[in-house]
């Protein structure tokens, strides 16, 4: 049984261009910017998306962030082929094929084309800014 003392709070992304990245989530997924602050010398932008918080922040003095590895297709699956977070997922309540086409028309890149998942549901991988896979 899950521990009721814990709930999922946020995803935190480090970005080379935090305002551009935040605006991408607004334009592509309808996120809402709810705060834009400076934290420890770097922009820190809070977005609400699907009832959850996405935080995008800029480079802080002393950091040397490494670029994320791109997602790769393998025989029966796709992966960043690296330890750590592979992707985060949204559940889309609507016609995913139509939404996929809408995103493609806006210039979104898809490292893996639409495909059926193990449970029979449709999967759509999106390349987001900063090497993030959704």
Walk through the language-model features, giving the residues of each.
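N-terminal beta-strand motif that seeds the catalytic metal site of vicinal oxygen chelate
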Residues: 1-22, 85-88
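Vicinal oxygen chelate
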Residues: 1-4, 100-134
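Residue-level marker for the onset of beta-strands and adjacent loop->beta junctions
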Residues: 9, 42-43, 86, 99, ...
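Core segments of cupin and vicinal oxygen chelate
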Residues: 13-63
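Acidic/polar helix N-cap motif
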Residues: 17, 94-95
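Short amphipathic alpha-helices within nucleic acid-binding modules
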Residues: 24, 95-102
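Short, flexible, mixed-charge acidic loops at enzyme active sites
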Residues: 60-77
């Amino acid at each position: 049984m899950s521990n009721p003392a814990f709930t999922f709070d946020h995803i935190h992304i480090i970005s080379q261009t935090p305002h551009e990245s935040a605006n991408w989530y607004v334009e592509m997924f309808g996120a809402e910017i709810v705060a834009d602050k400076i934290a420890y010398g770097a922009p820190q932008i809070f977005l609400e998306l699907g009832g959850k918080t996405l935080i995008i922040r800029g480079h802080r003095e002393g950091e040397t962030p490494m670029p994320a590895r791109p997602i790769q297709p393998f025989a029966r699956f796709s992966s960043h082929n690296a330890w750590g977070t592979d992707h985060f997922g949204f559940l889309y309540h609507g016609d995913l094929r139509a939404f996929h086409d809408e995103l493609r028309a806006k210039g979104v890149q898809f490292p893996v084309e639409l495909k059926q998942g193990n449970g029979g549901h449709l999967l759509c991988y999106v390349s987001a800014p900063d090497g993030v896979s959704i």
